[in-house]
Amino acid sequence: MNLNKWLLGIGICSLGFGLYMVFVKPHVDDYYLDHENAQAIENYQSKNVSAIPLDTPTDKSKMIGYIEIKDAHIKAPVYPGAATEKQLKHGLSLVEEDESVDEQNVSIAGHKAEGRHLQFADLYKVHMGSKVEFHTKGETRRYEIVSHRKVNPTNTSVLEEKVGKSQLTLITCDDYNPNKNKWMTRSIYVAKAV
């Protein structure tokens, strides 16, 4: 009899823990991530402009700015590249190791997670003409979304410099295939300086 009660107690605890992990924990994680991002952005904004580094920091944990896209409800810190799995845990990241915010084509990568409010998860909500603000180096750079396309994950042509106006290239994973447990394409959003 005691064994049955003990097993029932373990079963109920296991079920409760499983339900918490599936239904509650992602929301708690999102809450804390949003709070950390908001605090990082507030700290960045409160810095004296002269205290904001003009060069891309070599310390990968130091923000280089933050991006704001109102149509997609995105306001997230941006960190130096390269956009490795480890670096993307901090937040959005410049794609390449030696990339600078002063390049003609600044490429920024972010995670997309189904059912979670994380980095570029809501980027799909933008449309042609959506406004993008990149706050960096004590200034606000304004852009407008001009194109969206999907590419093969091995396509690096989206990172190339092009003659003309400055642009942001926003990159996130797309078309998740649960059978292969991988993202099949990359969504590329290009925003031109206005």
Question: Where are each of the predicted segments found?
Answer:
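Positively charged n-region of N-terminal signal peptides that target proteins for export
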Residues: 1-5
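Solvent-exposed, non-transmembrane regions of membrane-associated and secreted proteins
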Residues: 9-194
